[in-house]
């Protein structure tokens, strides 16, 4: 069954294959273009550097008019990531635009890693450490990076 959402996701997949953004990858799971596995590599020169963070993206038939649900599978310590892996990111909520594609979503998440929004924390402990004790925050992030290699 071909729907607008499925056609759009196939275009997104083709773009990810032919023009992948640096440090991110994603593809649909076998036999279901509506669920994708993704990986974000921690950006260089940040506490997340060298991390390999796995995510799952779930799309509904309303895509691209409705954003995907995106969740980290890898354990994360970040002000905008809930304990269950869900993200607090404006473009996945009230600032979504149908012009965003999978690549744009993943690069936005990659950018968020080193530029958290502490005004809207999902993880209050991480947010407080980021603001008040950067050394301890970096230590905790580096522990997360090391765990990401084992995932």
UniProtKB/Swiss-Prot annotation:
Its EC number is 2.3.2.23. It catalyses: S-ubiquitinyl-[E1 ubiquitin-activating enzyme]-L-cysteine + [E2 ubiquitin-conjugating enzyme]-L-cysteine = [E1 ubiquitin-activating enzyme]-L-cysteine + S-ubiquitinyl-[E2 ubiquitin-conjugating enzyme]-L-cysteine. GO terms for biological process: chromatin organization; DNA repair; protein ubiquitination; sporulation resulting in formation of a cellular spore. The active site is at 88 (glycyl thioester intermediate). InterPro entries: Ub_conjugating_enzyme, UBQ-conjugat_E2_core, UBQ-conjugating_AS, UBQ-conjugating_enzyme/RWD. Pathway: Protein modification; protein ubiquitination. It is found in: Cytoplasm; Nucleus. Gene3D superfamilies: Ubiquitin Conjugating Enzyme. Keywords: ATP-binding, Chromatin regulator, Cytoplasm, DNA damage, DNA repair, Nucleotide-binding, Nucleus, Sporulation, Transcription, Transcription regulation, Transferase, Ubl conjugation pathway. Its main location: cytoplasm. One of its GO terms (molecular function) is ATP binding. CDD domains: UBCc_UBE2A_2B. One of its GO terms (cellular component) is nucleus. It comes from the Eukaryota. It is an enzyme of class 2 (transferase). The keyword Transferase applies. Residues 4-150 form the UBC core domain. Belongs to the ubiquitin-conjugating enzyme family. Catalyzes the covalent attachment of ubiquitin to other proteins. Plays a role in transcription regulation by catalyzing the monoubiquitination of histone H2B to form H2BK123ub1. H2BK123ub1 gives a specific tag for epigenetic transcriptional activation and is also a prerequisite for H3K4me and H3K79me formation. Also involved in postreplication repair of UV-damaged DNA, in N-end rule-dependent protein degradation and in sporulation. This is Ubiquitin-conjugating enzyme E2 2. It comes from Trichoderma harzianum (Hypocrea lixii). The gene is UBC2.
């Amino acid at each position: 069954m071909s729907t607008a959402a499925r056609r759009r996701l196939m275009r997104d997949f083709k773009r990810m294959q032919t023009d992948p953004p640096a440090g991110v990858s994603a593809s649909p799971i076998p036999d279901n273009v509506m669920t994708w596995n993704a990986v974000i590599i921690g950006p260089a020169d940040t506490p997340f550097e060298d991390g390999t963070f796995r995510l799952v993206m779930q799309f509904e038939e309303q895509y691209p008019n409705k954003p995907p649900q995106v969740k980290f599978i890898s354990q994360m310590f970040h002000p905008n990531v809930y304990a269950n892996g869900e993200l607090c990111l404006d473009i996945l909520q009230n600032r979504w635009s149908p012009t965003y594609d999978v690549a744009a979503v993943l690069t936005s998440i990659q950018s968020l890693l080193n530029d958290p929004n502490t005004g809207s924390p999902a993880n209050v402990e991480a947010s407080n450490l980021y603001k008040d004790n950067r050394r301890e925050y970096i230590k905790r992030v580096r522990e997360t990076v090391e765990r990401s290699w084992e995932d």
